[in-house]
Amino acid sequence: MIEKIWSGESPLWRLLLPLSWLYGLVSGAIRLCYKLKLKRAWRAPVPVVVVGNLTAGGNGKTPVVVWLVEQLQQRGIRVGVVSRGYGGKAESYPLLLSADTTTAQAGDEPVLIYQRTDAPVAVSPVRSDAVKAILAQHPDVQIIVTDDGLQHYRLARDVEIVVIDGVRRFGNGWWLPAGPMRERAGRLKSVDAVIVNGGVPRSGEIPMHLLPGQAVNLRTGTRCDVAQLEHVVAMAGIGHPPRFFATLKMCGVQPEKCVPLADHQSLNHADVSALVSTGQTLVMTEKDAVKCRAFAEENWWYLPVDAQLSGDEPAKLLAQLTSLASGN
């Protein structure tokens, strides 16, 4: 229902307009206060890069963060990552992730990013505290990438990158809750890069698509072509589950059942194992896998995806960030 409201297919969005006006007024006032320096943002001693969204829902932001961290690491840059840690609840903040940190403590995305990149990752509702925690333990870190947080103006930033869904784009264009917008589309004029996941990019936007890898068994780590798996049940607890199901079909998989779950939904063995019958194979997203690995069964697999950016702009962006991190 919410997708139909935000896309404008359902007329119910009009009933929510008063709340959207209030949301827009408050969010605009907050940004203006920082812009006019009525409120002070904390500036880190190293450059900060924000990777965020203008809309609610999954746009492919986390794969972009992983891509960015890995690309900078390949250039010899030491990167730290901070996040709010949505869906997690730590005993205290800031929380610096370790191999023992669970998604219940830190949230799905931070654990995934930590496992994929081996970069220092810290979470806190106050992102500046997360930055301080990383720099205290890893003083050699040269640049901080913040996963989400475009609207978290308490943390000063040097570069802003926005990821948008190239198919859904901005829906009906209204602020939450009548539409999907956290900020209006005009905000794109002030950011440093716009990355478009799928669809047809517009002038000045960086094209991106998600490239699926081999399926990975949660228990054994065995890899295989996902099309070789039979009697597949697909599960996705991400911001936009249909994208994952479409990716599977693109890989030649016709799931017997597709199970969309809420983003950041807690998972346990009983609930997940109930999704598959004898002889069926469960295929999930990598984001779900970080929550299920501890209690996985032998017929559970996940499909990792990597962000692939096209054109000349990604190289220019990476050169800019490398120069910033190197102090040039």
Curated annotation (Swiss-Prot):
It comes from the Bacteria. Keywords: ATP-binding, Kinase, Lipid A biosynthesis, Lipid biosynthesis, Lipid metabolism, Nucleotide-binding, Transferase. GO terms for molecular function: ATP binding; tetraacyldisaccharide 4'-kinase activity. The keyword Hydrolase does not apply. It is an enzyme of class 2 (transferase). InterPro entries: LpxK (IPR003758), P-loop_NTPase (IPR027417). This is Tetraacyldisaccharide 4'-kinase. SUPFAM superfamilies: P-loop containing nucleoside triphosphate hydrolases. Its EC number is 2.7.1.130. It comes from Escherichia coli O157:H7.
